[in-house]
UniProtKB/Swiss-Prot annotation:
It comes from Hydra vulgaris (Hydra). GO terms for cellular component: cytoplasm; cytoskeleton. It is an enzyme of class 3 (hydrolase). The keyword S-adenosyl-L-methionine does not apply. The lineage of its organism: Eukaryota, Metazoa, Cnidaria, Hydrozoa, Hydroidolina. Keywords: ATP-binding, Cytoplasm, Cytoskeleton, Hydrolase, Nucleotide-binding. Pfam families: Actin. The keyword ATP-binding applies. Actins are highly conserved proteins that are involved in various types of cell motility and are ubiquitously expressed in all eukaryotic cells. This is Actin, non-muscle 6.2. It comes from the Eukaryota. Belongs to the actin family. Coiled coil: none annotated.
Length: 376
């Protein structure tokens, strides 16, 4: 990058974690929980300088005295005041930059309501005085990060999953399917099935422990019934986990029963199709001529696709649904937890992208609706 060029900022706001950094980098500089906490009680100590709100890791560490709120639900911003706090924290505390000096690329969920994109645009230009900004769809960025412009992305994070077919860089809105089943639901389900084993996890603090157990020990079985039999007849699948207080717990079939929910949502009482069927349904909503390209370029993205065994299982399940001669390829990049951010970093540093930014001047002339004309 030339010295006179200012690095663009790339901010990927997820339901669970916010990923932020500089365009051209290969990984985000800052990754922190998308939470805002407010004190539950009036401060007693004089001169403690208690703040009226905490964001991210600080909110997480003080969660005992705070009420925690997630401003992004199912991938979509629902609380703008808190969202503004998260962005403020991102710029000033995490990245330590002056937002008025850097163009910023934000990400949005597929099928994000129009009013939401306008609000994001308005806050960037009016509250943070950004010189330029752009809003890109998360799944499209994941596809770019894998070096493709055509394919179908299964993006599964903490709050929502989507299957997004993309042709020549454009998402096909009529074929996008949203599935309200993601990481947080899997954590809740693991809490429930661990309770059946006699371990009690109930508070929000304990939920974080269960999330860690899920991330470290869960995996997807290639054949669920077979795996259940193996687990019942031997202890080969059992693993132990040490809790923060030193107590050690043992976990067996829960390891693969937890992520099996992605393929069988009925486990948590949801009447929806699993991720394999949703991906297939999404492909079937597309023009018959491009289906072959989608089957051969099925890209996994997001933290909830990090389970070992998930790609093989997807390959098996989609092969069973697709026409018998169809070539099916599941792409699971090792860095897929951050592939949305990485795609944003790639896009914002392309020389051809520089004329795509919405400038402050364009915003002042046209208002927030400019976002629909320039970002699609």
């Amino acid at each position: 990058m030339a010295d006179d060029e200012v690095a663009a900022l790339v901010v990927d706001n997820g339901s669970g974690m916010c990923k932020a950094g500089f365009a051209g980098d290969d990984a985000p500089r800052a990754v922190f929980p998308s939470i805002v906490g407010r004190p539950r009680h009036q401060g007693v100590m004089v001169g403690m300088g208690q703040k009226d709100s905490y964001v991210g890791d600080e909110a997480q560490s003080k969660r005992g005295i705070l009420t925690l709120k997630y401003p992004i639900e199912h991938g979509i911003v629902t609380n703008w005041d808190d969202m503004e706090k998260i962005w403020h924290h991102t710029f000033y505390n995490e990245l330590r930059v002056a937002p008025e000096e850097h163009p910023v690329l934000l990400t949005e969920a597929p099928l994000n309501p129009k009013a939401n994109r306008e609000k994001m645009t308005q806050i960037m230009f009016e509250t943070f005085n950004s010189p330029a900004m752009y809003v890109a769809i998360q799944a499209v960025l994941s596809l770019y990060a894998s070096g493709r412009t055509t394919g179908i992305v299964l993006d599964s994070g903490d709050g929502v999953s989507h299957t997004v077919p993309i042709y020549e860089g454009y998402a096909l809105p009529h074929a996008i399917i949203r599935l309200d089943l993601a990481g947080r639901d899997l954590t809740d389900y693991l809490m429930k099935i661990l309770t059946e084993r006699g371990y009690s996890f109930t508070t929000t603090a304990e939920r974080e422990i269960v999330r860690d157990i899920k991330e470290k020990l869960s995996y997807v079985a290639l054949d669920f019934e077979q795996e259940m039999q193996t687990a019942a007849s031997s202890s080969s699948l059992e693993k132990s986990y040490e809790l923060p207080d030193g107590q050690v717990i043992t976990i067996g079939n829960e390891r693969f029963r937890c992520p099996e929910t992605l393929f069988q949502p009925s486990f948590i009482g949801m009447e929806s199709a699993g991720i394999h069927e949703t991906t297939y349904n999404s492909i079937m909503k597309c023009d018959v001529d491009i289906r072959k390209d989608l089957y051969a370029n099925t890209v996994l993205s997001g933290g909830t696709t990090m389970f070992p065994g998930i790609a093989d299982r997807m390959q098996k399940e989609i092969s069973a649904l697709a026409p018998p001669t169809m070539k099916i390829k599941i792409i699971a990049p090792p860095e897929r937890k951050y592939s949305v951010w990485i795609g944003g970093s790639i896009l914002a540093s392309l020389s051809t992208f520089q004329q795509m930014w919405i400038s402050k001047q364009e915003y002042d002339e046209s208002g927030p609706s400019i976002v629909h004309r320039k970002c699609f």
